[in-house]
Amino acid sequence: MSHNSFGHLFRVTTFGESHGPALGCVVDGCPPLIPLEAAEIQAELDRRRPGQSRFTTQRREPDTVRILSGVFADDRTGGRQLTTGTPIALMIENVDQRSKDYSEIRDTYRPGHADYTYEAKYGIRDYRGGGRSSARETAARVAAGAIARKVLPGVTIRGALVQLGPHAIDRARFDWNEVGNNPFFCPDAVAAVQWAEILDEIRKDGSSIGAVIEVVAEGVPPGLGAPVYGKLDADLAAAMMSINAVKGVEIGDGFAAATLRGEENADEMRPGNGGAPAFLANHAGGILGGISSGQPIVCRFAVKPTSSILTPRASVTRDNRPAEVVTKGRHDPCVGIRAVPVGEAMMACVLADHYLRHRGQVGERAPFREG
């Protein structure tokens, strides 16, 4: 069974390969009458676009998006382009492929990549840039995420790179306003300067390094999530784990919660305004029992160092002969950098899906009643 789609009511299907003519997605289930312009999607794609600094791949892709269906504009809409409730198809052309860079690994498996497992499963693989397993596929996710954000009124989703290899930010210097001021999406201005020096050395060595990304959603109402097998945190974890190179996900304090006592980990409550409680902490990351609590939803995921490096590594050929692999081509020394907008997009898609599912089950009722 193929699994190129995710979501229930807000459903996203992506298509395309790294070196194919194009990639894209189909978003089905977007409500009608939502204003949507290509420029809004393009703004998100530009944040992920390669070749914008020396710290990312130098593959030059404009990532220009085309909306092929699902929108309409005429004098009755005041000239505004609105969603129609039908599937929204988006396409992004590939224009800077260099397939010849991969000719040497046509019959050899790259260690740490999906070369062997794809061929073991399908009996065939597209060796040009990794084909479907390439992080290039995530451009389509970011495009879908831009639409998902439009479904979530009042919700703000932001991401940041909070750790580069073993080098974590200083939480005392965390500033969302800094994220757009450096090429790392780093919220710590001091750490960003240090990371530039570290990554320059990594690049000079022809190696790579991992990272930790944090994504926070604020303004999420309480009540989203479908226990017990459609918990909000379970779906978020699955969405983040589906991103290329992600090897771990945590919600709230995550694994650090295992080091706490019960009284330390409890998110105590006091009476708040409007009949809703006021929380005194957010160790749970905004999700309790698989349902959003109204607090900020906090998710972190770990990205491994890419295996596309210049260091010679032992491997085997398709006919099981010993081989040595040196990966050529243009690659990110830290794939975690451009994973930040991808993580935001996946958060948006999951929340949009759960928002529509919640509305379909319980309607538009307020989660709390006064009096």
Curated annotation (Swiss-Prot):
Cofactor note (record): Reduced FMN (FMNH(2)).
Enzyme Commission number: 4.2.3.5
Statement: the UniProt record of this protein carries the keyword Cell membrane: no
Binding site for FMN: 132-134, 244-245, 289, 304-308, 330
Transmembrane segments: none
Cellular component annotations (GO), alphabetically ordered: cytosol
Binding site for NADP(+): 48, 54
Pathway the protein acts in: Metabolic intermediate biosynthesis; chorismate biosynthesis; chorismate from D-erythrose 4-phosphate and phosphoenolpyruvate: step 7/7
Catalytic activity: 5-O-(1-carboxyvinyl)-3-phosphoshikimate = chorismate + phosphate
UniProt-recorded Gene Ontology molecular function terms: chorismate synthase activity; FMN binding
Keyword flag Lyase: yes
Disulfide bond annotation, renumbered to this chain: none
One of the protein's GO biological processes: amino acid biosynthetic process
Keyword vocabulary terms for this entry: Amino-acid biosynthesis, Aromatic amino acid biosynthesis, FAD, Flavoprotein, FMN, Lyase, NADP
Top EC class, one word: lyase
Needed cofactors: FMNH2
InterPro entries tied to this protein: Chorismate_synth, Chorismate_synth_AroC_sf, Chorismate_synthase_CS
Function of the molecule: This reaction introduces a second double bond into the aromatic ring system.
UniProt family annotation: Belongs to the chorismate synthase family.
Quaternary context: Homotetramer.
Stated name of the protein: Chorismate synthase
Species this chain originates from: Methylobacterium nodulans (strain LMG 21967 / CNCM I-2342 / ORS 2060)
Biological classification of the source: Bacteria, Pseudomonadati, Pseudomonadota, Alphaproteobacteria, Hyphomicrobiales
